[in-house]
Design a protein with these regions (language model features):
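Conserved beta-strand-loop-beta-strand element in the redox core of flavoprotein oxidoreductases
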Residues: 1-13
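FAD-site-proximal beta/loop scaffold in flavoenzymes
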Residues: 16-81, 91-92
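Central beta-strand plus flanking loop segment that forms part of the substrate or channel wall
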Residues: 29-31, 107-112
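FAD-binding beta-loop-beta segment adjacent to the flavin cofactor pocket
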Residues: 44-62, 113-133
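A structure-centric signal for secondary-structure junctions around beta-strands
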Residues: 58, 105-106
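Short, electropositive alpha-helical surface patch
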Residues: 75-85, 117-122
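Internal hydrophobic alpha-helix adjacent to the cofactor/substrate pocket in enzyme cavities
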Residues: 79-105, 111
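C-terminal auxiliary extensions adjacent to catalytic cores
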Residues: 120-166
């Protein structure tokens, strides 16, 4: 694969066994064009403390998921872990209490390695493994992880996550 840096006029050839391409991501224009955005962020995300999810300038503003400036992957797994932190901290702020809930950067990415195997890359802000399934090594490709992606995660999304139960 060739990686080209158009601004520097350079390119490098890089070999790989597995290529995981992440598309460019940014906040919507209405956030990018607002004062809540992080000033030095070209992607225009809402400027939040990465652990409390509270805005760094306006304490009544919280953000999570694809809109927040947390320095982690923008994944469904991340927002699933951010939502309870935001709710706890928002309620604490409304009651003038200290914000004690903390988001540690958990994110997850299911990586399909064949037609019937997958591994589940789970990590935190330090980019260290952060496994969430007890007794199962999700860092190596497994058939049961493929079944999780194919059947378990869609069911979890539609029946639990969207209803605030997971």
């Amino acid at each position: 694969m060739t990686i080209t840096d158009n601004s520097a006029g350079t390119s490098d050839e890089v070999g790989y066994d597995i290529l995981h391409v992440v598309p460019p991501q940014s906040a919507p224009d209405w956030i990018k064009d607002s004062p809540v955005r992080k000033a030095d962020d070209p992607n225009g995300y809402v400027d939040v403390d990465p652990n409390t999810l509270q805005h760094t300038q306006w304490p009544e503003i919280f953000s999570l998921g694809d809109a927040g400036s947390t320095p982690n992957s923008k994944t469904g797994a991340a927002i699933r872990k951010q939502a309870p932190v935001l709710v706890d901290n928002l309620l604490a702020a409304m009651e003038h209490r200290r914000l004690t809930a903390r988001y540690e950067g958990y994110a997850s990415c299911p990586i399909t390695t064949s037609r019937k195997t997958m591994l589940l890359a789970e990590f935190d802000y330090s980019m260290q493994p952060a496994p969430s399934i007890p007794l199962i090594d999700t860092t190596h490709e497994r058939r049961d992880m493929w079944y999780l992606k194919r059947y378990g995660l869609p069911a979890m999304y539609w029946n639990l996550i969207l209803k605030g139960r997971a």
